[in-house]
């Protein structure tokens, strides 16, 4: 993007004072890409996930007397945990193996606590087999995102 100084002949050290001469609008794909790669969006994902988990814990107390109501509060909690992990994985554009290991631990521990309140590895959704099955997908997405970051 080229800029022209506000006052002709006088350069500006602050780019905010310069006027853009590029009149080409951003395409929808570029705008969405900029939004999804912004730090604010990624932090927002983590915050929304935390709010879902907190809301679930609040509703667990009131739903303790209903046997079937546990599924109504477990679903938002699992979605919140997944949302937190997506936010963690997408920070800085790529997923390192350490981050993926951290996310697997967060998902397994969260499900353990939500299902019966104890950490006893009684997982049914986030099992080692299921999480290991998507290792290749996470790895390929990480490589793709790191290549995109290098080109920018």
Curated annotation (Swiss-Prot):
For this record, the Gene Ontology CC terms, alphabetical, are:
outer membrane
Locate the transmembrane regions by residue number. Answer: 43-63, 69-89
State if Membrane is listed as a keyword.
yes
Keyword Transmembrane attached: yes
Stated membrane topology is: Multi-pass membrane protein
The entry's localization annotation reads:
Membrane
Classification via InterPro entries: CRPA
| Region entry Disordered, spans | 1-20
Provide the protein name.
Answer: Sulfur-rich protein, serovar C
Q: Which species is this record about? A: Chlamydia trachomatis
Which gene is this protein's source? srp
